[in-house]
């Protein structure tokens, strides 16, 4: 039997991904139409079906988008409904509410509730008053995307709770959660939190040590937990005297009830579908195929909510399971013992996703899954037995003892293992790199590759060669010799220069109720694999340009700070200088006309002998034929004094966030830029950028880029000068790699098929 289901599922996934990335762009849709017309005319039947699956996937993000339009955005609303899921306990609890009424009218949408200060449990009926907000897409690469997350919950938007009241409700889910929580409170606080997280999917405690050693999957109900429960219930019912078929059916019913009880998270739903297919394959006399069952589970999950595809829970669950099914027999065939082959195959499947989402991987995770999980398994099964039999004094005491001891040993050993050296930290992997990783993994381990005869070995070289030929020009796109990112930091300035050295010009930092350092700047630097800043330039000491510099020096290795001469010794600035002294970070006072060479990158520093914003540092950055001018918050007077010192540039960082008191006509005429970049916050209180500045730039046909509407603006040396928005950069690095993946996919599809027993 052939395995077309794998190809059809990959086609569906590719379609969903393309629909999300490219949306309804006409050029993309036309190219898809031309490609699939050719495919349906010349392609084989299996390729036609794969093309149809791709088109289905392409439409799913639009057909299953739960978000409302902006009609309610910013409005004060009152919603009544039932709590469906709880995401966090404590002072800042978050809920998923299944709405029933909104402002008195019946609704069926779900809402993500923030700022909940009272603890609630699933099944509880509540009334929420607050401001409705449509989620915003992430404007910087690699960071948490609130819009996709809200979509993955199936919610129409979020509500910042101002007032919450409980309503009378008698619901089976509420009663069940209250019973489980009351019984778990009989354990110690740490054990209670661990069991709440693993059984119910919410609870207090961070358990950072488990994340450090790759055991974070036990903190949310997943396939691992379902496997333990199925093993326990099936054998318990068999020992009770039920026949195998009856015991299997009752086990399936109990597991689906448990899934409904905690809200069917993606990993648990996958396991439920696969286990159900396994159980019912026997009476229907159908051969169970684990990979096909995995594909069926993926189809069901993605039809329920295609936005799950972009969430860690879905990718880690399906990626780990797929690699377990494919690599486990291959590793055993290579002579790896089955005890080691099991966690190793899962680790290989999870590796790229862990590097993508977390930027780090711990090799000790393989041994941790072998040595530590048995202790957790005892605690988990013991806790379920305690929920059922804990009311009997003797048996309850015995079960409680074993649960406490095994969970305590598990957590102590986890904390010790987290202290071991060897953790690998790197720049976050992007999606094209992950695709290539899995293709190469397939080429290395698949039975199709192993069974190709020598006379057909040209296929392997053709496929692999095509891949790398397509990938070669992308290397410069992904890792160009010069990249300058104008980070979407809000109302402020922050620019990161990557080349031979890592440099920063300003850090942003004015709070406006949100910490842009902890929320944007520092996570982005870590995702980019940056731990050292070789030079930090501060144009002037306004908070929106430099306030994050204090924490930057604390959390990263900064080798030098460069300041303009105009300084006001505020308490913040004095603390900053003391911290630099404590961390032995050199602080340099710049002089006008000073030239800095960072490899093949040259920075010309200039400033006027003026105070306030007009004392801002202005910099001309030159690398090969690429030239960029930073102006800080300099106004007309500074521009007039300094413009003769600068040669024309290709890119202008427009002064003072687009204020009408900056960027004069004579200045623009002198430096003659082709691109203008405006760094400002969305709907900021200053009205930046001012319309007068926009009109000046448009009159001179300067292409305008804005961080408030277009997100992070990237300038890079990619076959010359390239300026792109966050959305454009995502697309341009994806297309060539996609072409390579298509060639490889077609080559593998048309290659020699293999028998099922070669896989499993």
Predicted regions and their residues:
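N-terminal leader/targeting segments
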Residues: 1-71, 148, 152, 158-163, ...
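Internal transmembrane alpha-helical bundles of multi-pass membrane proteins
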Residues: 9-13, 264-452, 634, 640-652, ...
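Membrane-interface helix/helix-cap signal primarily in integral membrane proteins
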Residues: 57-217, 519-528, 532, 566-568, ...
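Aromatic-rich juxtamembrane segments at the membrane interface
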Residues: 152-274, 279-280, 535, 560, ...
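Active-site environment of divalent metal-dependent phosphoester hydrolases
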Residues: 226, 266-268, 512, 541-546, ...
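Core dinuclear metal-dependent hydrolase active-site scaffold
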Residues: 306-309, 415-535, 581-648, 709-738, ...
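Active-site metal-binding motif and surrounding structural segment of the metallo-beta-lactamase
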Residues: 500-503, 509-563, 644-659, 672-677
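Cap/insert and terminal regions of metallo-dependent hydrolase folds
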Residues: 641-711
């Amino acid at each position: 039997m052939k395995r077309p289901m794998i190809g059809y599922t990959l086609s569906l996934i590719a379609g969903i991904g393309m629909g999300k990335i490219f949306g309804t762009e006409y050029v993309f849709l036309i190219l898809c139409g031309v490609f699939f017309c050719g495919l349906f005319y010349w392609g084989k039947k299996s390729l036609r079906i794969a093309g149809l699956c791709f088109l289905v996937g392409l439409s799913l993000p639009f057909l299953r988008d739960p978000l409302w339009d902006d009609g309610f955005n910013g409005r004060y609303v009152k919603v009544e409904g039932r709590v469906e899921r709880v995401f966090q306990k404590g002072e800042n609890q978050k809920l998923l509410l299944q709405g029933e009424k909104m402002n008195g009218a019946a609704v069926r949408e779900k809402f993500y509730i923030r700022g909940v200060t009272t603890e609630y449990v699933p099944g509880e009926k509540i009334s929420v008053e607050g401001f409705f907000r449509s989620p915003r897409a992430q404007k910087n690469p690699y960071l948490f995307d609130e819009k996709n997350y809200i979509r993955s919950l199936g919610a129409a938007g979020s509500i910042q709770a101002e007032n919450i009241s409980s309503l009378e409700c008698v619901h089976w889910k509420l009663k069940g959660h209250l019973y489980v929580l009351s019984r778990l409170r009989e354990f110690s606080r740490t054990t209670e939190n661990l069991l709440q997280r693993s059984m119910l999917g919410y609870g207090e405690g961070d358990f950072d040590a488990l994340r450090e050693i790759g055991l974070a999957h036990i903190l949310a109900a997943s396939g691992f937990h379902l496997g333990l429960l199925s093993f326990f219930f099936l054998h318990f019912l068999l020992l009770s005297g039920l026949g195998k078929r009856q015991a299997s059916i009752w086990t399936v019913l109990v597991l689906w009830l448990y899934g409904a009880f905690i809200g069917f998270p993606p990993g648990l739903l996958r396991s439920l579908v696969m286990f159900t297919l396994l159980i019912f394959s026997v009476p229907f006399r159908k051969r169970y195929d684990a990979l096909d069952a995995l594909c069926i589970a993926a189809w069901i999950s993605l039809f329920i909510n295609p936005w799950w595809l972009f969430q860690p829970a879905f990718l880690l669950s399906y990626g780990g399971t797929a690699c377990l099914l494919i690599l486990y027999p291959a590793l055993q065939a290579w002579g790896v013992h089955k005890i080691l082959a099991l966690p190793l195959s899962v680790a290989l499947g999870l590796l790229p996703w862990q590097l993508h989402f977390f930027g780090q991987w711990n090799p000790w995770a393989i041994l941790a899954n072998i040595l530590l999980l048995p202790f957790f398994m005892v605690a988990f099964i013991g806790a379920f037995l305690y929920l059922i039999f804990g009311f009997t004094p003797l048996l309850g005491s015995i079960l409680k003892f074993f649960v406490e001891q095994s969970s305590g040993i598990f957590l102590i050993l986890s904390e010790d293992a987290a202290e071991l050296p060897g953790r690998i930290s790197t720049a976050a992997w992007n999606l094209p790199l992950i695709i290539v990783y899995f293709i190469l993994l397939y080429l290395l381990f698949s039975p199709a590759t192993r069974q190709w005869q020598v006379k057909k070995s040209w296929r392997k070289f053709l496929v692999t060669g095509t891949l790398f030929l397509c990938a070669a020009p992308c290397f410069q796109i992904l890792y160009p010799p010069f990249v300058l990112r104008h980070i979407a930091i809000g109302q402020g300035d922050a620019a990161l220069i990557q080349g031979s050295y890592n440099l920063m010009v300003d850090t942003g930092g004015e709070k406006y109720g949100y910490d842009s350092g902890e929320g944007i700047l520092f996570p982005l630097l870590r995702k980019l694999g940056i731990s050292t800043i070789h030079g930090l330039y501060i144009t002037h000491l306004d908070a929106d340009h430099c306030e994050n510099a204090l924490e930057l020096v604390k959390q990263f290795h900064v080798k030098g700070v460069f300041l303009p001469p105009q300084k006001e010794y505020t308490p913040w600035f004095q603390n900053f200088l003391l911290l630099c002294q404590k961390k032995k970070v050199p602080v340099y006072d710049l002089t006008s006309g000073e030239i800095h060479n960072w490899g093949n990158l040259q920075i010309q520093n200039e400033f006027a002998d003026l105070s306030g914003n007009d004392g801002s540092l202005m910099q001309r950055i030159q690398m090969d034929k690429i030239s960029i001018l930073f102006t800080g918050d300099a106004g007309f007077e500074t521009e007039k004094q300094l413009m003769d010192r600068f040669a024309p540039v290709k890119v202008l960082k427009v002064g003072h966030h687009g204020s009408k008191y900056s960027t004069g006509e004579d200045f623009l005429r002198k430096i003659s830029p082709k691109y203008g970049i405006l760094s400002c916050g969305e709907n900021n209180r200053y009205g930046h950028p001012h319309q007068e500045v926009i009109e000046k730039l448009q009159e001179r046909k300067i292409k305008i880029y804005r961080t408030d509407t277009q997100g992070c603006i990237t300038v890079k040396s990619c076959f010359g000068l390239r300026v792109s928005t966050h959305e454009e950069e995502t697309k341009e690095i994806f297309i060539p790699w996609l072409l390579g993946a298509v060639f490889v996919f077609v080559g593998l599809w048309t290659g020699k098929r293999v028998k099922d027993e070669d896989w499993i």
